[in-house]
């Protein structure tokens, strides 16, 4: 058969990606033709893509061609896939065609483009989130995924048009985009020109009618409540009524924590931070804070959990720092290890072990793995040309030399890796190299070194990845980085250095050398555990019983997904390898980068001097966690999130619920007689709680935080609509209703305190103390919403949880930490000219929007006159527009009315 495609024709993307399905089952010849070539003789207009079958017949519908390839591969049709294909043709394509036309032909940007397709993108995101599966039709990729990916790729390959808040869509799109057939399809059709490659094709298309891009009504945006079945409501009520008796007994505490047969044993690591660096906020969110959230969640689930980290203390970075400070390398390690430990303690990081790599156990385990690799023929010897500084009389390994990156031209690349493009570098490849210590130009000299024979281990690695990746929770960027290295072919990697500070090489002729830090740094996880317990092998040589989660920033991925697995596989000693590799993108500071030397950005040892509590830092860093793409810390945004999400939403609800118990019922939880509306609220809270669990089990940490805030908003609306402060003054029935509303609200507050524990442990403990939540309910989180504060339960003294951040305070901190280059919020890429209002004006507008939104909800709940509701809705829309302008954002196109 023969497949005809053309450059710059969007329909060719999915068919080329789907053609990979037919490999090995049929011979497919791919021919590139011009878009005006008539391939199908009986069509009146030129058409591509076209599949000419061996029978001589033609298929010229994109979905039909894709379906044919999938059927050839043995794929079986299903109703859900067919539904997605119908939706793609009738709903997505018209909206997407309009968006691409506006972008490429008319040169529009931002919401003018995204507005026409936003509803469709949101539908995909909600569907993926609701079913909690990686693909549209379930756990495995289907025809629907390829067809929709191909349709969306020209637009979404630009991150500006992939909304960050649609995280499920983001993850799905990244997963597919990193697959080799999809990458080849994109290269063939777009020719590295991006969406502009479609210009000639789109210019020949008719201008879309307004209806194709329209999503306009006068209804304000509201959160969409899922439709509940009677069974879901009944199950929620049953779980609620069982209360505390549903809780299982607490797991007994172990010391040391060791794997237990028959239980889920979760081993969690954070990438080991270089000891000589004080971590900034980006380092903290990328490794330790993200892992801490998951470790705390694992303990709430009663999983047998061990969480470890430590300082990476060997290597050139330590020697360089020692020279700078006039100390020995060991003195540098001792000094900065304490600094790291103090920072993580202040941030409430709940390590079971925080160790270090300068230990006898590190030497013993590293040398043992090396000897096993050497014995099995996986170590090579070779002569290496190295840079040597004649002035300092030393070889310039790794961080002792800087120069221009040979790949991307970055002027401060190190001798081992470029921080900008992430590529590994041999020091002699640097352009314009300089000694980091004296800044003189080095000379090239030869030296004998040892190499890990990665090409010889590549097949084992690919087989292991083939077993591990399906069904795992590797982040898309981790998969992409790993696959890109394998696609280029692994090369032998030098594992020794001409240094004094490191793990000695136990081989004759190499006594004056040490192991390269990234050969032995990942072995640090094992040695840190060995210093914790002499039974460390029960964790690290037990892949059948241990689930290993490793957290890091994306620049550390190759060493965890390639170098250490190859070392462990080559040693053939049944080592536990990573099951789930969780990598973040980068966190920037305002509109620049963190820089200790320039005094730009907040570093860990400075955060505690700001007067802002550790839990507020934790909340904001997790709220902006760079999961799918780089994100940026913003002082203005920190103020807004604290004052809106924490103070006005979460804190307001929990404080009101507790205060009503104290003020109206003497501090005792009142009797609750649930109405059908109350029972529906139980079911909605239960669904959101289950969504929270689904997200955290998939390590979607930022998204799960949104579930907490959503439940809090439900609670605020519930109180606002039912007005217990008024009902308590009314009839007996009114007072009973006030009691029910108050009792249910304070139980929601109790649930939120437990859900908050992984994110804000101090705030969580404060809420639980105020409510005097029974101890078992503080330490276990089930998937159902339980009544943990029954009628008659006495609560403690209730007080506000959060303090308002003031504009003067934030502006002072901005100036102090070098944020002067970003006195206004970073401008969205889609806006050409904006004027940002002062934070106090923004806050005032946010308060007005909240107040007006409550008025609208109350009127709707009371089924008020339509004209009265419409008038208040108009006020709300106007306030939202004012707020968008004040924040420097384009006012969003109003969304269509949602079906109830």
Swiss-Prot record:
GO BP: any one term: methionyl-tRNA aminoacylation
Regulation: Enzyme activity is increased by spermidine, EEF1A1, and when the Mg(2+) concentration is increased from 5 mM to 13 mM (in vitro), possibly by promoting the dissociation of the complex between the enzyme and its product.
CDD domains tied to this protein: Anticodon_Ia_Met, GST_C_MetRS_N, MetRS_core, MetRS_RNA
Covalent S-S links between cysteines: none
Effect of residue 702 to W: Found in a patient with spastic paraplegia; uncertain significance
Enzyme Commission code(s) on record: 6.1.1.10
Role this protein plays: Catalyzes the specific attachment of an amino acid to its cognate tRNA in a 2 step reaction: the amino acid (AA) is first activated by ATP to form AA-AMP and then transferred to the acceptor end of the tRNA. Plays a role in the synthesis of ribosomal RNA in the nucleolus.
Protein name: Methionine--tRNA ligase, cytoplasmic
Gene: MARS1
